[in-house]
Amino acid sequence: MSIRRGAEVTTGMSDERARDEPGPGVESVAGAVGGKATPRSGRSRSRLRGVFRVVAALVAAATLVWLILRDTSPVGHFDSAADKDRYLDAYHEAMREMPEPERVLDVRTSYGIVRVYRYAGPAETGEREPFLLLPGTRSGAPVFAANMAGLLAQRAVYALDLLGEPGMSVQDRPIETHADQARWLHEVLVALPEKGFHLLGLSIGGWTAANLAVHEPEKVAGLILIEPVQTFAGLSTELMMRSIPVSVSWFPKSWRDDFNSWTAGGAPVEDEPVGRMIEAGMSTYTMRQPQPSRIAPERLRTLQMPVLAIIAGDSPMHDSAAAARTAQENLCHGTVKVYPGASHAINGEQPQRIAADIADFLAD
C-alpha cells in the first residue's frame, strides 16, 4: 500500500596495614595474647584476604558481563529473530480465529508504526462512529476474537496492536510519559477517516483508552472499558507478587501458563491460540515504556463522553467492589456493570452479554 508521511497510513582500607588494623570498638585478637600474632593467625588472615580477592574478582567479572550483555535499547523489541518468529507463529494462529479484515493498515506515528485492522459492519450503520479495540498487555488484536461477531453486528470495527507491546506494531522512538502514550494513539485516530470512535479497551487497553480521553479527547466519542486496570482501582498485592517471577523470560513456560490461568479464573490456557500468543509475548518481547499509574479520580471527573465500565466480580487484578464504586462516584456520564463470578478473562467468558450491554449503552 502507498505511504503518507506525518501521521500516515501505509498498507515492522587503601594499604595492607590499614586493612589489618581493627576499627574502633573492636578488640584485637593479637592484643589479647600479649601483642603478638601467632603464625597460625597470620596465615588465617592471609587466606582470608585471598578469599576476599577472589570474591572481589568474581563480582567484578560478573558486573562486566552484565554491562556487556544488558539490554540498553530505549524501545520495545523482540529479544531475537527466533523469538520474533516464535511469537508471530502464535500470533498468526490466533488471528485465524478472527474474521477476515476489510483492510490492513500500518499507521505511521511519531513513536512508530501501528498495525490496524478494519472490519466492515452492517451497511445500514451509516455514519455511526466505529469501535476501536485496544487489547491487553502482551497480547494483540486477536484477543478480541470471541467478541467480533457481537460487535460487527452493530457497527464497523477497528482493532490494533498496542505500540511498544508484542504484535505487528513497531516502536521506533521512546515512549517516556503517559502523554506520549496518548499522543501516538491520538495520531492513529487522526490518520483514520472517521470523525470519532468508541474506544473499547480490555485490561491495559482500558487504561490506554481512558488515558487518551484524559489527555487528548478530541476524537473520542465514547469509552467502553472492560476490566480496565489502574483506572478505577490499584493493582492487587497478590497480582504484583505473582507477576514478578513470570516477568523473567527464561523462567519455565509452565509458570507463565499458571499465571495466565490464574487471571482467567483457573481455566486452562496453554491449549488456546490466544493463550499461546500471550505466553509467547511474555517470553519473547522486552517492553520499554513507563508502567501505567493509577488514573486519579479528579481526572476521571473531567471525562465528558459517555463511559461504560464493565467490571469482573471475581477479578484477581483489583478490588472489584472498590473499582465499581470509584467508577460510579467519579464518571459524569458513566454506566457501571459488575458481572458476578467473572474473571479477568471476562471478554472471552461472556461475549454475548458484553455485546448486549454495549448495544444498550450506545442506544441510550
Where does each model-flagged region fall?
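Flexible "cap/lid" loop of the alpha/beta hydrolase fold
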Residues: 214, 222-250
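Conserved HGGG/HGGXW glycine-rich cap/lid loop of the alpha/beta-hydrolase fold
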Residues: 119-167
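Active-site loop/oxyanion-hole signature of alpha/beta-hydrolase fold enzymes
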Residues: 159-198
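Alpha/beta-hydrolase fold catalytic core
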Residues: 2-6, 10-130, 154, 363-364
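Catalytic histidine-centered segment of alpha/beta-hydrolase-like enzymes
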Residues: 342-351
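Gly/Ala-rich beta-loop-alpha elbow adjacent to hydrolase catalytic centers
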Residues: 201, 205, 209
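Conserved loop-alpha-helix segment in the C-terminal half of the alpha/beta-hydrolase fold
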Residues: 310-342
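Conserved alpha/beta-hydrolase catalytic His-Asp/Glu region
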Residues: 234-240, 249-304
